């Protein structure tokens, strides 16, 4: 299927905006990339790239063509998956973008348990925010997105949604870890707070609630990495916040407590795909597995 390989040349130039960078990623000569682009433009009878002093940019016709390229590539992966399914191989790859809150604990367990039954299946997972998740879905860079507070978009199909509370996270030696039951946000005001950046969905949920309250929570550290925030809790008697599916009460170094403030809002964790897109067979199997794990998590955390 050399023609699909040559279409991949075009896709790489579109992504990088540079023939040189695309050729380096493809491990071919720049002249080979340019030759294939010229062949396609001759066949279409129009330019698909503008040649700029500092790179290449898709024309309007190029935007249409690149959508065809990416759709064709995704369809080929689906057909390969279906053929392998007919042969009983159950192999292939699942591509997934996820909110950062899911990366440390929840998702590794889900993927590992799926691979116990499907050892030939690989995963390509990218941690991202909801804006980049939308882009990845629309550009066929991913099969699925598992994102907290995903924006409503007409071209997305929400396969499953799960309500999520915000929890307080602390080291197990923290004084509040010895307090049984839920906490009020005012209980947190007496301790240093290490919080996600304002671009993180859980932080936005918290800020909206506090904007209607008479007290404020002032973080001493803000970071867009949950790994860093958890790591920091080992060195100071500080508190952080996390959605319930990412909370930990497994006897490890961290503990979590629910927030019991009246009218405290919940967000939604959504598993989504591009509406109308046919996914690889193995992706549908993973969806069913993920649904069960999300339902189990909802029962465990009482959401």
What are these model-derived regions, one by one?
Residues 11-29:
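Short helix-boundary/capping micro-motifs
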Residues 40-41, 114:
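Conserved amphipathic alpha-helical core elements
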Residues 156-166, 170-193:
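Flexible hinge/capping segments at coil-to-helix
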Residues 15, 41-58, 63:
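A short LG(V/I)-centered, amphipathic sequence patch enriched
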Residues 91-154, 223:
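Central regulatory/effector-binding core of bacterial HTH transcription factors
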Residues 129-134, 138-142, 147-148, 201-257:
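Hydrophobic hinge/microswitch elements
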Residues 183, 192-213, 279-288, 294-302:
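Secondary-structure junction motif
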Residues 106, 257-300:
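A late-sequence structural motif
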């Amino acid at each position: 299927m050399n023609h699909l390989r040559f279409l991949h040349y075009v896709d790489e130039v579109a992504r990088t905006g540079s023939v040189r960078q695309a050729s380096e990623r493809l491990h071919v000569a720049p002249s080979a990339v340019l030759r294939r682009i010229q062949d396609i433009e001759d066949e279409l009878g129009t330019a698909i790239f503008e040649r700029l002093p500092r790179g290449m940019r898709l024309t309007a016709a190029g935007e249409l063509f690149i959508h065809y390229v990416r759709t064709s590539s995704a369809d080929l992966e689906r057909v390969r998956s279906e053929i392998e399914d007919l042969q009983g191989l159950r192999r292939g790859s699942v591509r997934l973008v996820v909110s950062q809150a899911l990366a440390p604990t929840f998702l590794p367990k889900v993927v590992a348990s799926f691979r116990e039954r499907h050892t030939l299946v690989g995963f390509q997972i990218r941690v991202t925010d909801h804006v980049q998740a939308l882009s990845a879905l629309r550009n066929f860079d991913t099969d699925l997105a598992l994102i907290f507070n995903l924006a409503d978009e007409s071209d997305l199909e929400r396969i499953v949604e799960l309500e999520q509370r915000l929890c307080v996270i602390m080291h197990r030696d923290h004084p509040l870890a010895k307090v049984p039951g839920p906490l009020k946000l005012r209980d947190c005001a007496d301790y240093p707070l290490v919080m996600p950046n304002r671009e993180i969905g859980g932080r936005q949920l918290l800020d909206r609630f506090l904007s209607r309250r008479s007290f404020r929570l002032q973080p001493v550290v803000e970071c867009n990495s949950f790994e860093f925030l958890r790591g920091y809790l080992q060195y100071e008697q500080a508190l952080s916040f996390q959605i319930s599916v990412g909370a930990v009460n497994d006897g490890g170094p961290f503990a979590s407590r629910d927030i019991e403030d009246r009218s405290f809002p919940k967000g939604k964790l959504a598993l989504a795909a591009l509406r109308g897109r046919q996914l690889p067979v193995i992706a549908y199997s993973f969806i069913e597995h993920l649904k069960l794990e999300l339902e189990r998590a909802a029962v465990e955390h009482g959401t």
